[in-house]
């Protein structure tokens, strides 16, 4: 398993580098890329945002392993994960309104503080302290995915008055470097935990200086901005009306809830499947992120003017790949007949599918959901998404250890078949909808929204 992991990592990394180098050679520089004021503004944003992302990714490979290291049972670990997901649901519902009221800059600094406290709780072996840490992690995750983007968009439009068309360029670059940071974070986690022999708590301690630096830079370099015009209740009510009045939005939300709930369960299960076979967890995680980056690169190539595939087609392909991978996992995790290499390949395929899924879903959401209602609609998407993931982990909590993992993959397979049916339903509704198609390339090359 050790050799397989390193070999897969090298092959995936080489594939990603090859695709990115060919893209860089072919990509012309635009006006936004050469504007000094815009580049300085981007740098101010990226310095803080990338440090926050790096700290987040650094903790991912060894979370389950840390709880195992503290001798908690799988059922107890499942409850810790459920606590984190439930916290994400609760704080995610009010995060946008809280950030708008408190201030985006203050919210980013608050993220650094709460996530640092979350990391510090990992030094304790007390179960209650770890539960509190998971709750803090849920709050931090909600702030990470709301405060930073809200701050950037407001500053971009209101303070600097840059063109709206330049916003996707910033987030497309951020999406690419997010993958790169994730790959590097996996290697760094492996280095501090295993190569340096510091144990599974080391990545969490190493994340604290990154979070402190991110908070300090935001406090020193960023201006404050607010948006106190819209109440949380009005945001949710408007989102619910949009969700119920447009079948496309309802189907898209169903696909997102089903697909991403399975991904949450996958995040919990991959470590107990591979770790008993001597897998280097940091390198495995980096391989996953490289596979996801490869999927994103393939999405960009597929939607380019040369191939001109549509995001709806790639969304369908992503769901199909995950269905196939989960069926593989139901066989590769059979008690007494485990095949860790086959399971690893299935996990890589799931991550490749995620690389296709997220830009496709992002494109379709932006086209289907009115901009003013996106926050409210996404709140309603998050509730079933996290509830499904929590239910799945609770089912695993009550299962027999030997068969529970395989049963969980079987349930996930059934959930993804339902997602596939929802994709077919959405495809039927939107097949003649020109609004949801990438426009034919004329003049300037198309840059997909990531």
From Swiss-Prot:
Cellular localisation: Cell membrane
An annotated GO BP: monoatomic ion transport
GO molecular-function terms, A-Z: molybdate ion transmembrane transporter activity
Database matches in Gene3D superfamilies: MFS general substrate transporter like domains (1.20.1250.20)
Principal place of residence: membrane
CDD domains: MFS_MFSD5_like
Alphabetized UniProt keyword annotations: Cell membrane, Ion transport, Membrane, Transmembrane, Transmembrane helix, Transport
Cleavable signal peptide: none
Pfam families, A to Z: MFS_5 (PF05631)
Topology versus the membrane: Multi-pass membrane protein
Transmembrane annotation, as ranges: 1-21, 43-63, 79-99, 128-148, 176-196, 198-218, 249-269, 278-298, 311-331, 344-364, 376-396, 409-429
One Gene Ontology cellular component annotation held by this UniProt entry: plasma membrane
InterPro entries xref list: MFS_trans_sf (IPR036259), MOT2/MFSD5 (IPR008509)
Similarity field: Belongs to the major facilitator superfamily.
PANTHER family: MOLYBDATE-ANION TRANSPORTER, SAM (S-ADENOSYL METHIONINE) TRANSPORTER
Function: Mediates high-affinity intracellular uptake of the rare oligo-element molybdenum.
Protein name: Molybdate-anion transporter
């Amino acid at each position: 398993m050790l050799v397989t992991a390193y070999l897969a990592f090298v092959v995936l990394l080489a594939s990603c580098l090859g695709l990115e180098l060919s893209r860089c050679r072919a990509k012309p520089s635009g006006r936004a890329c050469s504007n000094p004021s815009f580049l300085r503004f981007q740098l101010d944003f990226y310095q803080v945002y990338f440090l926050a992302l790096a700290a987040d990714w650094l903790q991912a490979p060894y979370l389950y392993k840390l709880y195992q290291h503290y001798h908690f049972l799988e059922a107890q670990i499942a409850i810790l994960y459920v606590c984190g997901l439930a916290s994400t649901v609760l704080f995610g519902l009010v995060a946008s309104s809280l950030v708008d009221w408190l201030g985006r800059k203050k919210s980013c600094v608050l993220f650094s503080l709460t996530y640092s406290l979350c990391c510090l709780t990992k030094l304790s072996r007390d179960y209650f302290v770890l539960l509190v840490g998971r709750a803090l992690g849920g709050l931090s995750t909600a702030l990470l995915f709301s405060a930073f983007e809200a701050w950037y968009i407001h500053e971009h439009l209101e303070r600097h008055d840059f063109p709206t068309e330049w916003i996707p360029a910033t987030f497309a670059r951020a999406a690419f470097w997010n993958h790169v940071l994730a790959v590097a974070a996996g290697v760094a986690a492996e280095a501090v935990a295993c190569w340096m022999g510091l144990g599974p708590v080391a990545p969490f301690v190493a994340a604290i200086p990154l979070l402190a630096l991110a908070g300090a830079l935001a406090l020193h370099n960023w201006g404050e901005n607010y948006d106190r015009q819209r109440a949380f209740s009005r945001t949710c009510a408007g989102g619910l009306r949009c969700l119920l009045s447009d079948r496309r939005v309802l189907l898209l939300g169903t696909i997102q809830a089903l697909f991403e709930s399975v991904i949450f369960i996958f995040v919990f299960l991959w470590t107990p499947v591979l770790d008993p076979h001597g897998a280097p967890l940091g390198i495995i995680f980096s391989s996953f992120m490289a596979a996801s980056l490869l999927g994103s690169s393939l999405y960009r190539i597929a939607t380019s003017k040369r191939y001109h595939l549509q995001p709806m087609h790639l969304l369908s392909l992503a769901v199909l790949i995950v269905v196939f991978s989960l069926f593989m996992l139901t066989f590769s995790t059979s008690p007494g007949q485990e095949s860790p290499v086959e399971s690893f390949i299935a996990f890589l395929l799931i991550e490749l599918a995620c690389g296709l899924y997220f830009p496709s879903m992002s494109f379709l959401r932006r086209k289907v959901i009115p901009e003013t209602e996106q926050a409210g609609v996404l709140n309603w998407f998050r509730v079933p998404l996290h509830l499904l993931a929590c239910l799945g982990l609770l089912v695993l909590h009550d299962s027999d250890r030997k068969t529970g993992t395989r049963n969980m993959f079987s349930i996930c397979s059934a959930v993804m078949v339902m997602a596939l049916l929802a994709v077919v339903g959405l495809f039927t509704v939107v097949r003649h909808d020109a609004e949801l198609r990438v426009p034919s390339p004329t003049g300037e090359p198309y840059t997909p929204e990531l």
